[in-house]
Amino acid sequence: MKKIKREDKVMRSTIYISTLLILLVMNLSSQSIKVGDKAPDFKLPYATKDTIVFSGVSLSDLIGKRNIVLAFYPADWSGGCTTEMCTFRDNFSELSKLDAEVLGISGDYVFSHHEWAKHLNLQFKLLSDHKHEVAKLYNSYDENSGYNKRTIFIIDKTGRVAYINWRYDVRNPKHFEELQKALADLK
């Protein structure tokens, strides 16, 4: 009888330790970027209303020049994303006065970005992260839907994350106001 109890304890201990290890690994893999962290560098092709640049732009090339607004969004030509990008377009001069450069990032190809930017008359770059590598790096990719999550990051001139909105809501004007305030605080 004692032998069974000992084996039972060993089995429970093994299960307990295995469960803890699994939870630890899951926690480490789901850690996300925090305000104050160095922003992960990347290089992606992009389009504007005027051109397509296959050689791309890297975050490190932009650091030190202006504050960067990384706007991850699900897809070109969709309602919510159109609203979001038009908000950036309509407030472009104010964002420029706040020393900000907007970079929209989705999984769409640069050809779609180019046509959409022309259609909406967007003044900023739309980056093509077709394999979602950058979105995953920034914990802004939804595995279930296969699209980017709608998230906003501000990267300051030193290359640090200064602001994050994990659930940016295009229908909530306060979210854009918070973004503007965060940029104003960096001036």
Regions found by a protein language model. Give the residues of each.
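A short beta-strand-turn-helix
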Residues: 43-67
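Short active-site neighborhood of thiol/selenol oxidoreductases, capturing the structured segment around
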Residues: 58-83, 88
